[in-house]
A protein has these predicted regions:
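Extended amphipathic alpha-helical interaction segments
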Residues: 1-186, 193-196, 215-216
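C-terminal non-catalytic accessory extensions
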Residues: 206-209
Length: 216
């Protein structure tokens, strides 16, 4: 990321919501909490709320994280490694470790909230759970119908994909707009409405609503 920023200083880097969630899940698995995540609805919902912090205004992320962390440790205090999970998310995505000295001062997180925050996109009605590249990769998987295609199948698949992309490009320059799949359009609208309620309800209620919509 640093090398990219140095090469393209005016570019704005925005992380993907899908990969933010995957990062949290990988840590859950690493800490041996996979079974609990799969079987305990309350724990699973709280874990998903961590990624839902991406829909909180950047300036409010740290405070919202503290509220969520307090709720998690209070509601499920007996879960082993829960503090490690929260510390991982805090130091990786919210803020670094507390600095010595008076007052509450923290070092920078590995990934500043600016880099993974999704709120502006949701407010503008372009909320996504995956990015464009992720969608293209999924399209290729559907096209090949296998994980390891033969060379000829791979070439024919690329030719077919090129034809589809060329047709889509021609439709775009002639003003023809392909409609979104209805269920995804409805989901984006629901996320946009939910984001609009921020500040009108308790932050935990807000995070749970976003977390639910992200996995329906």
């Amino acid at each position: 990321m640093g090398a990219f920023t140095a090469r393209f200083p005016s570019a704005r880097i925005t992380g993907c919501y899908f990969h933010l969630g995957q990062s949290v899940i990988r840590k859950v698995n690493e800490l041996g909490l996979k079974t609990l995540y799969e079987t305990d609805d309350a724990f699973r919902g709280n874990v998903r709320c961590l990624a839902a912090l991406s829909h909180v205004p950047v300036e409010d992320v740290a405070e919202a994280f503290e509220i969520l962390a307090d709720d998690i440790t209070t509601s499920i205090p007996a879960v082993e490694h829960i503090d490690e999970l929260l510390s991982y998310f805090e130091h990786t995505y919210v803020r670094g470790r507390r600095l010595r000295g008076r007052g509450e001062r923290y070092g920078p997180a590995i990934f500043h909230p600016d880099s993974w925050n999704q709120r502006n996109g949701a407010v503008d009605g372009i909320a996504r759970t995956t990015n464009i590249v992720e969608g293209w990769h999924h399209g290729l998987q559907v096209l090949f119908q296998c994980s390891h295609p033969t060379m000829w199948r791979f070439i024919r698949g690329l030719e077919s994909d090129c034809a589809q992309q060329r047709a889509s490009f021609m439709q775009g320059i002639t003003g023809i707009i392909q409609p979104s799949v209805r269920k995804y359009q409805r989901l984006r609208e629901r996320v946009t409405r939910a984001v609009g309620t921020y500040g009108q309800t308790h932050v935990l209620t807000y995070l749970r609503a976003i977390a639910h919509l992200s996995y329906v």
